[in-house]
Design a protein with these regions (language model features):
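Conserved acidic carboxylate
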Residues: 9
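Two-component/phosphorelay signaling modules centered on CheY-like receiver
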Residues: 12-30, 117
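Acidic, metal-coordinating helix/loop segments flanking the phosphotransfer/catalytic sites
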Residues: 31-49
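Acidic catalytic/metal-coordinating carboxylates
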Residues: 34, 60-63
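Active-site residues of response regulator receiver
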Residues: 53
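The feature encodes the CheY-like receiver
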Residues: 57, 75, 103
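Alpha4 helix (beta4-alpha4-beta5 surface) of REC/receiver domains from two-component response regulators
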Residues: 63, 85-102, 108, 112-115
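Hydrophobic/aromatic residues positioned on beta-strands within the core alpha/beta folds
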Residues: 80-82
Length: 120
């Protein structure tokens, strides 16, 4: 069974590129454009990994990450935070995500990071 990754990204172009890349790597991908869609999917199935944009139209990835890490059922799910802004050090202080990546990012590096988290 393929590993399942939830991608939460409001920019449709970036979301589609990430989804395409991950599907090519044989992952099952649930792409969400906002936090409401993400939480709806979480009620259906827990993923093996979550990739979160920090700025979303109806909330932010930091709050989602915090909620995931505080919940016994979801705290072990690896979270990668993405941002187009260079304030990831500030985000690291507020959020217990396993990884942080700046946009734009190298697709090969991104794919390798995802593979490392899902190899365990």
């Amino acid at each position: 069974m393929n590993k399942c990754i939830y991608v939460v990204e409001d920019n449709p172009n970036i979301r589609e590129i990430i989804e395409f890349l991950l599907v090519e790597e044989f992952y099952e991908v649930k792409a969400c454009q906002n936090s409401k869609a993400f939480w709806r999917e979480m009620n259906v199935q827990l993923p093996d990994m979550v990739i979160l944009d920090i700025v979303l139209p109806d909330g932010n990835g930091i709050d989602i990450c915090t909620a995931l890490k505080e919940n016994v059922k979801t705290r072990r799910i690896p979270v990668m935070m993405m941002s187009a802004n260079n304030y990831l050090n500030t985000v690291k202080a507020k959020c217990a995500a396993e990884d942080f990546i700046n946009k734009p990012f190298d697709l090969n590096d991104f794919a390798q990071r995802v593979a490392q988290f899902l190899a365990n």
